[in-house]
Amino acid sequence: MADLEEQLSDEEKVRIAAKFIIHAPPGEFNEVFNDVRLLLNNDNLLREGAAHAFAQYNLDQFTPVKIEGYEDQVLITEHGDLGNGKFLDPKNRICFKFDHLRKEATDPRPYEAENAIESWRTSVETALRAYVKEHYPNGVCTVYGKKVDGQQTIIACIESHQFQAKNFWNGRWRSEWKFTVTPSTTQVVGILKIQVHYYEDGNVQLVSHKDIQDSLTVSNEVQTAKEFIKIVEAAENEYQTAISENYQTMSDTTFKALRRQLPVTRTKIDWNKILSYKIGKEMQNA
């Protein structure tokens, strides 16, 4: 092991550490960071070399953050990244600094983003917040309106998590939806992601995603937002149901094919009986 450590350069060590951090399960960033910190044993090298991994993790995970003085949380996503550690809160029309390691928001300031489709963004946000409140106990959503490849685009992001470290499991749901504001009809593109980590009696991770495409009739802002939510709700309900059914099928078939519930004799071993036989035999020999 010592020879291997001597062969690894600082750059290689940081690269390996960054991979561990980026792939940390939901709600377990701090645990992975602390373990990597002990392994690397060089705080300056870790902070400087793996800073991009801290940022990438938060962007990928849609990390929610509370801004002091504002009621609703906002998601940290690539769509709100203004550069230099600053992010956009489109609902409150502010920007703020975000510490990717501490996961803290500071220095909120007024910020006027693109307002060409602000009325569309607001309508979608209002409808999406009502939907998230109904379907996600701990859900957070952020809706952006911005120009993408020259087209006015609405981007809606949803995040919901349950961190149950005391019960040895953590999980997160993420979904991202996009459509361009064009006359008559447009294409809705979505991606749904689920990640769950269970580690009480073993170490099992569920990592799943699904791509969605559907057509959306574009009329006025409010009606279009309602139709958009119908697409989102139908797709996410179908995905959740499919995941549940798939795991029931896996429990009934795949898992049984991987491991026998009973040994080859088709009978359970009575360990108490075996123990009593052994004790009885030892007593006879005494």
Swiss-Prot record:
Keywords: Acetylation, Actin capping, Actin-binding, Phosphoprotein. The modification Phosphoserine is found at S9. This is F-actin-capping protein subunit alpha-2. Disulfide bonds: none annotated. Component of the F-actin capping complex, composed of a heterodimer of an alpha and a beta subunit. Component of the WASH complex, composed of F-actin-capping protein subunit alpha (CAPZA1, CAPZA2 or CAPZA3), F-actin-capping protein subunit beta (CAPZB), WASHC1, WASHC2, WASHC3, WASHC4 and WASHC5. Interacts with RCSD1/CAPZIP. Directly interacts with CRACD; this interaction decreases binding to actin. F-actin-capping proteins bind in a Ca(2+)-independent manner to the fast growing ends of actin filaments (barbed end) thereby blocking the exchange of subunits at these ends. Unlike other capping proteins (such as gelsolin and severin), these proteins do not sever actin filaments. One of its GO terms (molecular function) is actin filament binding. Belongs to the F-actin-capping protein alpha subunit family. The gene is Capza2. SUPFAM superfamilies: Subunits of heterodimeric actin filament capping protein Capz (SSF90096). PANTHER family: F-ACTIN-CAPPING PROTEIN SUBUNIT ALPHA, F-ACTIN-CAPPING PROTEIN SUBUNIT ALPHA-2.
